[in-house]
Amino acid sequence: GLILGGSITQNNFLGTGNKVSIGLTRSEYQSRYNFGYVDPYWTTDGVSLGYNVFYRTTDYKDLDVDVASYAVDSLGAGVSVGYPISETSRLTFGLTAQQDKIKTGLYTVDEIFDFVNREGDSYLNFKASVGWSESTLNKGVLATRGHSQSVTLEATTPGSDLSFFKLDYRGQVFAPLTDTYTMRFHTELGYGDGYGSTEGLPFYENYYAGGFNSVRGFKDSTLGPRGTPSRGVGVTGNVGTIADSDNDPLPFGGNVLIQGGAEVLFPLPFVKDQRSLRTSVFWDVGNVFDSKCDQVKNTNGSASNTQCNDISLSNLASSVGVGVTWVTALGPLSFALAMPVKKPDNAETQIFQFSLGQTF
């Protein structure tokens, strides 16, 4: 699928030394707008203070994007404080207020209707977060040496309409093989759940897998559990399943994410200046899972989200391929040509993928 993204960053805004950023990402079904302001030296010992405002729209409601049908509008603002604990690592604490509005669509699955019936369709949540990050990368873009990793715990606080948490880890390592060839290993893990009166992770906070920055060779967000098609009365008066045109169960995401991979970075032949180019052969692997697949029931008592697999490495999707990233004045242009090696049932493949504004 086509993903367009761009950002403008000024590291010394009006000579103050503060950082201002404006970001925009658009795809067929999602738009994200973000404004950020960071004072990197709020105190003399390097404590930073940041603010951000964001607006996101995700609309699977009317589009044929092979994902369970719904739309969510999110508006929020946050503040964060960062503490350096060494030259390469820091702790970050944040607090965000976020308003979410859910809209159901023509092919909305039972799990979404069930959640909306329990919790309503509009939520104001206050999220507190704590994170640790470390980086020894030699470059911010198209790095070739070093490593980076981060761990973040985010949870809603008392006074929120919903009670849930998410724990995420990201890491990557660059290991030079020769002067021009580099091995890169990367992984991303995530787990979320509800607590208190909220049963499970809210569906719109689910993890998804497939596509760029995930498992290339598969359509965006189409790996993992499938939803339960709703039943209703058709134009003939008969009760039947409300499904899309091909009657396939639609991807619903999950509360567990496992993905990673390895790639060999090498120079593109016959190109003298390689500073703005990255070429690789890669192996991607990953999937999302529902840890409560056999526990959740719909309002009619039937099993919810029956189209899901046990959390197991044997149930991971995988692909191999080649990728190219070219950093231009408009932002990074990334291309991937991938072939699925292990394809889960109902997974949607996409051999060629293109992105503007993202790197892998």
Where are these regions (language model features)?
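C-terminal outer-membrane beta-barrel translocator/porin domains of Gram-negative envelope proteins
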Residues: 1-2, 106-309, 346, 353-359
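Gly/Ser/Thr-rich helix-start
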Residues: 16, 218, 287, 322-324
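C-terminal structured "cap/appendage" subdomains that terminate the fold
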Residues: 295-345, 352
